[in-house]
Amino acid sequence: MPFSANQLDELKVLNHYSQPSSMTGIKIHHDAAPEMIEAAKRLHEKGLTDHQDGGYLTDLGCEALENLQALERLLA
C-alpha cells in the first residue's frame, strides 16, 4: 500500500524534529506551505505533537520519529 500525499507530508513534518525527545520542538509558521500546516494539524490530531502548529513531540510522536529514523537508516 503506497503512502498517500497527506501521509508523506506528515512524515516530512515529523522529520523536522531533530531527535525523538519531548525537549525539542518546532514551529510551523502561518506562511508555511498549506500542506505543511495541514500536516502539522493532522499530527496533532493523531496525538503525535502537543500543538497544532508543531510544538513538542508526545511519547507517541517520539516513538514515531524513532521508527522513521530507523527506516531512513535502512534505506540509506
Language-model regions, residue ranges each:
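Generic alpha-helical scaffold signal
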Residues: 33-37, 51, 59
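A short, conserved structural fragment
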Residues: 44-54
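Accessory beta->alpha helical hairpin/"wing" motif in late/C-terminal subdomains of nucleic-acid enzymes
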Residues: 53-76
